[in-house]
């Protein structure tokens, strides 16, 4: 039986502080939060058969949620009065109209807003932001993972720098090979799990570096 519902980072917070909590931003992606009003949605809880008592307490990302438990402090060798926050603001994307791009396995683009909005095409997702406002998020499923796939699975190398050395400044924007980075389907803006990747513009004289450049630019653009 389910005792409590929490996200992975919330479990770490719980082990540190003993507090069952999450932040509004992460809760926005659980499909159980009324993002506009920043509270758990009774409608969604009823649909999913989830009791609100099993859900974590909600905090703004910057708010302290507690201090270390005696056990955690002893294990980590830290003072017990160390303050633990729900999350952190590290990219400076606070206040309306700020943009942040985060690239990892997938790639996300965040645009902050002072007001709540819903994209009727469902290409962007609305989340609560750390400053009490909101942000719209677009996500591509394959970002830096495309470079990893190309280098390691196709070229059989982990020397990324060597592969990118031939891509000099004069070649940027001048490549005639294009790469569609849909290796795992796509979310924003297509929401199409059947989307597939492709190289376009290949010729007999297409050099290896042009393909590497196409992979990088395909993700970037």
Please tell me what each predicted stretch does.
Residues 1-22, 31-42, 46-49, 64-221:
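Active-site core segments that coordinate phosphate-bearing ligands/cofactors
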């Amino acid at each position: 039986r389910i005792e409590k519902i929490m996200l992975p980072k919330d479990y770490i917070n719980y082990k540190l502080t003993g507090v069952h909590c999450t932040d509004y931003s992460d809760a926005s992606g659980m499909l159980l939060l009324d993002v506009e009003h920043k509270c758990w949605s009774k409608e969604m809880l009823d649909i999913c058969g989830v009791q609100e008592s099993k859900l974590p307490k909600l905090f703004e990302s910057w708010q302290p949620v507690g201090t270390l438990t005696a056990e955690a402090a002893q294990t980590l060798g830290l003072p017990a009065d160390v303050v633990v926050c729900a999350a952190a603001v590290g990219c400076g994307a606070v206040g309306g109209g700020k943009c942040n791009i985060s690239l990892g396995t997938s790639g996300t683009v965040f645009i902050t807003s002072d007001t709540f909005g819903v994209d009727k095409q469902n290409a962007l997702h609305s989340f609560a932001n750390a400053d009490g406002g909101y942000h719209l998020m677009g996500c591509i499923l394959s970002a830096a993972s495309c470079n990893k796939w190309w280098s390691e699975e196709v070229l059989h190398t982990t020397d990324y720098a060597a592969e990118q050395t031939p891509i000099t400044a004069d070649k940027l924007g001048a490549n005639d090979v294009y790469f569609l980075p849909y290796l795992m389907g796509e979310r924003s803006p297509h929401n199409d799990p059947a989307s597939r990747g492709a190289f376009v513009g290949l010729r007999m004289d297409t050099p290896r570096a042009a393909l590497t450049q196409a992979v990088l630019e395909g993700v970037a653009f």
